[in-house]
């Protein structure tokens, strides 16, 4: 149980960064093309 609690925040942070980076790229592409 303790291992899952310690690893889940470790996984959430990179996932949020990846999602934010992808969304940012999509916004930039959308602005460039439109």
Curated annotation (Swiss-Prot):
InterPro entries listed in its UniProt record: DWORF
UniProt note on tissues of expression: Highly expressed in heart (at protein level). Detected in heart and soleus, a postural muscle group of the hindlimb containing the highest enrichment of slow-twitch muscle fibers. Also expressed in diaphragm, which contains some slow-twitch fibers. Not detected in the quadriceps, a fast-twitch muscle group, or in cardiac atrial muscle. Not expressed in the prenatal heart but gradually increases in abundance postnatally.
Bilayer topology annotation: Single-pass membrane protein
Chain ranges passing through the membrane: 12-32
Keyword vocabulary terms for this entry: Membrane, Sarcoplasmic reticulum, Transmembrane, Transmembrane helix
Any one Gene Ontology cellular component term annotated for this protein: sarcoplasmic reticulum membrane
Keyword Transmembrane: yes
Recorded phenotype for the gene knockout or disruption: Mice produce offspring at expected Mendelian ratios. Slow-twitch skeletal muscle fibers display delayed Ca(2+) clearance and relaxation and reduced SERCA activity. No significant differences are observed in peak muscle force and no differences are observed in relaxation rates at low, non-tetanic stimulation frequencies. However at tetanus-inducing frequencies, relaxation rates are significantly slowed after tetanus.
Localisation: Sarcoplasmic reticulum membrane
GO biological process, one term: positive regulation of ATPase-coupled calcium transmembrane transporter activity
A Pfam family recorded for this sequence: DWORF
The keyword Transmembrane helix is assigned to this record: yes
UniProt GO MF annotations: enzyme activator activity
Known function: Enhances the activity of ATP2A1/SERCA1 ATPase in sarcoplasmic reticulum by displacing ATP2A1/SERCA1 inhibitors, thereby acting as a key regulator of skeletal muscle activity. Also enhances the activity of the ATP2A2/SERCA2 ATPase. Does not directly stimulate SERCA pump activity. Binds preferentially to the phosphorylated E1 and E2 conformational forms of ATP2A2 which predominate at high Ca(2+) concentrations during the systolic phase of the cardiac cycle. Competes with ATP2A2 inhibitor phospholamban (PLN) for binding to ATP2A2 and displaces PLN.
Swiss-Prot/TrEMBL domain comment: The transmembrane domain is sufficient to compete with phospholamban (PLN) for binding to ATP2A2.
Quaternary structure, from the entry: Homooligomer. Can also form heterooligomers with other sarcoplasmic/endoplasmic reticulum calcium ATPase (SERCA) regulators ARLN, ERLN, PLN and SLN. Monomer. Interacts with ATP2A1/SERCA1; the interaction results in activation of ATP2A1. Interacts as a monomer with ATP2A2/SERCA2; the interaction results in activation of ATP2A2.
Protein name: Sarcoplasmic/endoplasmic reticulum calcium ATPase regulator DWORF
Lineage: Eukaryota, Metazoa, Chordata, Craniata, Vertebrata
Gene symbol of the encoding locus: Strit1
């Amino acid at each position: 149980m303790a291992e899952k609690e310690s690893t889940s925040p470790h996984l959430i942070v990179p996932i949020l960064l990846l999602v934010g980076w992808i969304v940012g790229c999509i916004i930039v592409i959308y602005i460039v093309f439109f």
